[in-house]
């Protein structure tokens, strides 16, 4: 049984609802009619139940409040549209967790993690390091756009995750209460955005125009990598989700991940991430391996034209205000 105390946490707020046309007709219906003869009488519920691009036309923009781990699940869909509130926005020492965890045996471990952050702060450790003690059950928020089809894919994923951990029943219920997705979901295929990385895939290399980098990195870095949607990613996130200590894993805990993309895209990412002051330290291990397969020179640095586009970000990290 789901704990009675603090049953609900995931919060969905619709910012912009783009499911209806200006004359009040569902956009899936509009798109469907444009592709069919005028005498087509397919019911709207039937159209909304079809697992096809027609249901990628209507969409909603939402603010989502959830755990860090849930944010990473959302971002694992390679077609995600997201602008996240990173854990840097709020003081790491003041992180909060859902009531679901406050009244559980994990709370003692969560308190210890908060104490470690405070101890590091007193010792003068920089924020880049002490924030890694934040647990992945900590609250965060982000803004996202999801199509009708995307909503159902997320809903079906939550149904699967709820079989592993009852906490996900909260998110599944919130999604269903907001959009009544259960009425349409059965006809949609289940898409696993976090397929398990296999042992024979734990290698780096180059095949034609594709470069693959295998790394054991922090969950915090994974959170940055996964935002680059042109990357094909496989990792052991599902293994972490299934672990008994899942919710007290931290941003600093390791995750095994394989990252693949075309050479030109790798160069685009390096161009953004190779600034030694702003982000190079965080991305260094990935960049070093990628450089074994990609020719990267001074022209690929973000400041190659004599102007640093990340001046303010670099200053904030240097002063520990970011």
Predicted regions and their residues:
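Family-specific signature for flavin-dependent thymidylate synthase
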Residues: 1-322
């Amino acid at each position: 049984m789901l704990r009675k105390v603090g049953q609900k946490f995931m919060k969905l707020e619709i910012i912009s609802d783009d499911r209806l046309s200006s004359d009040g007709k569902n956009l899936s219906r509009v798109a469907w009619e444009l592709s069919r003869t005028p005498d087509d009488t397919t019911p709207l519920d039937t159209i909304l139940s079809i697992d096809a691009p027609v249901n990628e036309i209507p969409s909603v923009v939402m603010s989502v409040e959830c755990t860090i781990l849930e944010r990473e699940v959302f971002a694992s869909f390679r077609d995600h549209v997201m602008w996240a509130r990173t854990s840097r926005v709020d003081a790491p020492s003041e992180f909060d967790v859902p009531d679901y965890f406050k009244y559980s045996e994990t709370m003692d471990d969560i308190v210890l993690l908060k104490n470690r952050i405070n101890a590091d702060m007193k010792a003068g450790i920089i924020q880049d390091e002490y924030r890694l003690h934040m647990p992945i059950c900590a609250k965060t928020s982000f803004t996202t756009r999801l199509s009708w089809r995307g909503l159902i894919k997320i809903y079906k994923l939550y149904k699967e995750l709820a079989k592993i951990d009852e906490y996900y029943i909260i998110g599944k219920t919130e999604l269903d209460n907001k959009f009544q997705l259960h009425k349409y979901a059965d006809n949609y295929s289940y898409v696993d955005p976090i397929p398990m990385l296999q042992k024979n895939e734990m290698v780096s290399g180059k095949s034609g125009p594709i470069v693959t980098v295998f790394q054991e990195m922090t969950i915090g870095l994974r959170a940055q990598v996964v935002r680059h949607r042109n990357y094909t990613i496989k990792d052991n996130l599902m293994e972490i989700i299934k672990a008994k200590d899942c919710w007290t894993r931290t941003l600093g805990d390791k995750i095994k991940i394989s990252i693949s993309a075309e050479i030109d895209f790798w160069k685009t990412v390096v161009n953004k991430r190779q600034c030694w002051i702003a982000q190079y330290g965080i991305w260094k291990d990935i960049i070093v391996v990628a450089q074994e397969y990609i020719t990267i020179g001074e022209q690929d640095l973000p400041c190659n034209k004599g102007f640093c586009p990340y001046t303010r970000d670099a200053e904030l990290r240097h002063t520990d205000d970011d």
